[in-house]
């Protein structure tokens, strides 16, 4: 189902830009398909995918920031250092998994 936000942010600007709304619908979300510059596409699915990628990128940025914080505050005590390194290793594993989900890993 198409939300009001998607109509405002995606469909209305497309119509104003000269894109043609077709009489066919997206099999995935039910939105009308559009044609612009010879390309037929579902603007709602593209918008949702872009939004999802941005959210995933935000998560990765938070994890990388935490990784940097740990890297710049390594303790001198060996036991504490091992805990820091374990946490850093786990963060790297999670970051790698996010990248795979995005198709970048």
UniProtKB/Swiss-Prot annotation:
InterPro entries: SSSCA1, UPF0148, UPF0148_domain, Zn_ribbon_RPB9. GO terms for biological process: DNA-templated transcription. Pfam families: Auto_anti-p27 (PF06677). It comes from the Archaea. Belongs to the UPF0148 family. NCBIfam families: PRK00420.1-2. This is UPF0148 protein PYRAB12700.
